[in-house]
Amino acid sequence: MASAVRVLKKEELCRPELAGKSAFHREWMKEYDSALLRFIQEEDAEGFEPVFIGWFHVEDTDEQIPRYLKKRREDKVELIFQRLLYPEYLSGEDRTLLEKYLREHMPYGSRAKEHTVVFDMLCDPSTEYGTDIAYMKILEKAGCLTKETISLLMEQMEEAAAEITAFLLKKQAELTKGNDYFSEFEL
């Protein structure tokens, strides 16, 4: 409910009188999911309002736009992770769309040339995304962990928790199993 007010700004979703009643919970979550999907599908620059700090120099907006886009993309990924972490009443179709967004915004994804916000958030040691195994499991279910992305993650997450390193090594071994030349000679 906090994310509905914080990011989505949909007043009709903030109805505390319905949130506690189990009969309306499914309906509320469907409304939340549709608002979340609309937010994710919006252009990243949507809603940008330049704030002129100096004497209305162009440099002011040149610095503001990249920061705004980065924050907006991070908000989208944060909400996707949050929803996939707590998937109660999440439809299969909505799950597919959320997972697709994650896949597209990883290295080697279809939108990777624009940015790799998911990867950047995972590699930032100041966030929970690179330190909690739950997010790696979400990426695994979404199909984001390929041989290439795991190698990049291992390089960038040098000081990752042992649990995450073990998880990534295990996943990498699963993906390369059968592709190893020497495995043919094992007994």
What are these regions (language model features)?
Residues 91-108, 135:
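Repeat-mediated protein-protein interaction surfaces in helical alpha-solenoids
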Residues 37, 48, 64-66, 98, ...:
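A generic signature of intrinsically disordered, low-complexity regions enriched in glycine/proline
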